Amino acid sequence: METHIGSVDGAAAAADNGAVGCPASAVGCPMTSARPAPVSAGEASLGRHLARRLVQVGVSDVFAVPGDFNLTLLDHLIAEPGLRLVGCCNELNAGYAADGYARARGVGACAVTFTVGGLSVLNAIAGAYSENLPVICIAGGPNSNDYGTNRILHHTIGLPDFSQELRCFQTVTCHQAVVTNLEDAHEQIDTAIATALRESKPVYLSISCNLPGLPHPTFSRDPVPFFLAPRLSNKMGLEAAVEATVEFLNKAVKPVLVGGPKLRVAKAGKAFVDLVDASGYAYAVMPSAKGLVPETHPHFIGTYWGAVSTAFCAEIVESADAYLFAGPIFNDYSSVGYSFLLKKDKAIIVQPERVIVGNGPAFGCVMMKEFLSELAKRVNKNTTAYENYKRIFVPEGQPLESEPNEPLRVNVLFKHVQKMLNSDSAVIAETGDSWFNCQKLKLPEGCGYEFQMQYGSIGWSVGALLGYAQGAKDKRVIACIGDGSFQVTAQDVSTMIRCAQNSIIFLINNGGYTIEVEIHDGPYNVIKNWNYTGLVDAIHNGEGKCWTSKVKCEEELTEAIGMALGEKDCLCFIEVIAHKDDTSKELLEWGSRVSAANSRPPNPQ
């Protein structure tokens, strides 16, 4: 049994792939019904072959920055009718955009030039690697005749060895290919793309600048779709894992389920919800899994994030006598400085290909999606934890009413953001206090949600917003970005305007790096204030559609949101003036615990 990439059948299967919360047009795996346009034999060049392969796997947009080593390749990408080249202001944002696009569409791609472009995009590719996103990073390389000649080229560090870029990418991609001849090019390209999809990680593909326009018989006129053999469980291991887990859970009094971020890569969102339905357990999500499973399910109890969890969620999870974590990542951020009150002997850890029950046994070659589906058939129904939650739950209060023209509070801002959400919207949360405020948003069915928790690179959200909005055109995306993060990557607001996107950006201007203030304060956390609306107006420059507003009180915010919701075909930028000390209580708690973890003294030698 094999999975057919690029077929109508594959697209139909993808609609039920378990990627709950993803747009219908942007399934969690990169199968689409897009068919590359046929070309004549004379046009069957390397560049067109790559372009058609990208279209086959679901890439409609490539985020690029031109440079002399990739110009010919870009010509061939542009020539493919099913592919659009999105020119970005810098390579970092192009990489972030490919990251956001992969979140929306299942796979993304960016194109840069040799070394100066490659090393610039490297940070974004590292982030995509940490978040398990298949991004195809294409770099234009030197002329194939220059390899091994002892020549020194521009855009290098002045050595005749051209491998510096390749070696940098080896640590942040799952596969690397340097294409310097036509004979093997088709295999190198196909292997790189297939590996990205199979591993759900970025790949690096360097193509010599003199090759894209050259034809070769292997670049067939009507390319036959390649196949990805699906990963299957070892049946004996699967049965043993299910049996051990059923025994573990069925003897528990108040078991719970917790969804983690690797539900995405395992395409197990639907299987997880099916297990909730079958078991009756209360379920929560880890913060980086928000948006991967529905929050409208009656047994959903919120975000489990240790000391900064949703109210009453941590009490239920940590008091359970058995907890199944599906696809967790336990790092210092998600564990609030390693302060989780969890016991390993009570935990079942289900990773995409492995199950660990308590302190053992462990079962390898067990696919999460299959495991959860089989478990749902055999686990006993037990609603005790959910009933306990209902007994202690007290509805969350509302922010204090604002006085007329009172300076705007951040909790009032997010009260209004909550009202904006529906099934046609999505939320992008930047690293910082927006992490914590956006976690408290209650997502309607079908509302998307993305943030970058594992890598946590400030500025990610601007490029990711560009890419996500380009990949999910059925969504109106709402981005919450701090001023410090915005200063890193602000330029590509111009690309959003060029692409006629209609996202709504809330720029929270509180004068500094708030999240870092709460971890460790110092004068370096204060930034130069910008006229952010003036900056965006200057970027707009009368070309395209863009509307800006600066708000300082709730009355102005209400009016601005009303205008933004009315401007449905326009990029809307709302600068929110906030007090520098106006932070969520969760950030205050989280920051102190992460600070304590960071400042641990060295272990005695």
From Swiss-Prot:
Region ranges (Thiamine pyrophosphate binding): 433-515
Binding site for Mg(2+): D483, N510, G512
Database matches in InterPro entries: DHS-like_NAD/FAD-binding_dom (IPR029035), PDC/IPDC-like (IPR012110), THDP-binding (IPR029061), Thiamin_PyroP_enz_cen_dom (IPR012000), Thiamin_PyroP_enz_TPP-bd_dom (IPR012001), TPP_enzyme_TPP-bd (IPR011766), TPP_PDC_IPDC (IPR047214), TPP_PYR_PDC_IPDC-like (IPR047213)
Catalytic activity: a 2-oxocarboxylate + H(+) = an aldehyde + CO2
GO cellular component, one term: cytosol
Gene Ontology terms, MF aspect: magnesium ion binding; pyruvate decarboxylase activity; thiamine pyrophosphate binding
GO terms (BP aspect): aromatic amino acid family catabolic process to alcohol via Ehrlich pathway
EC number: 4.1.1.1
Family classification: Belongs to the TPP enzyme family.
Quaternary structure and partners: Homotetramer.
Protein name: Pyruvate decarboxylase 2
GN (gene name): PDC2
